[in-house]
């Protein structure tokens, strides 16, 4: 889609079949919604695809990049209200990178960059990310955190651990702390993007949770149905990878 800027007819048909199968598997009267992100919103034939799916009874909400960023930021505020300091939240998807910057729980700005692991291919164009060097420099360096989410972030974190780039963790803990080692060694498509983001943002910690846009959409649906603030029940232990970064080594 990112190369041709079009959703092939075969993929539209396949999506219909997947949605129909999913709908059939749900108990009757189960509330559900369908949301589409960067690939759908950038496709030149999105109106045609949207109409065809609607004709089959499937109403799709096409999210903007800023709507994605807001959903994810809202999720983390609900789930981890104790997060403090200056936090940059980066959610990397297939076609876009959603960013939210907050200080002491106050949102400062949000942005959506045309940078994703499927769009990037083997050599990602980091120019949209490099443009943030000056805005980053204006933010206080003290108590900086970077929260990276999405499937690419989880894959990156798991590869860092499995390849021994991080040492063994302490069993039974929901937050694992690791000392910083070269992050580019993880052979994932997202490693270059995340490594450059760390070099630019210079955080004291990187947090890699296992929740992201999907959970943000679920939380949003729950709050719409209940008409009140909600919080997802994620179990007693939410898997989180927390990486401590000695500042002298961030740029290495």
Give residue ranges: language-model regions.
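Glycine-rich beta-to-alpha transition loops that act as phosphate-gripper elements at the mouths
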Residues: 39-40, 92
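A short acidic Gly-Thr/Ser loop motif
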Residues: 90-96, 149-152
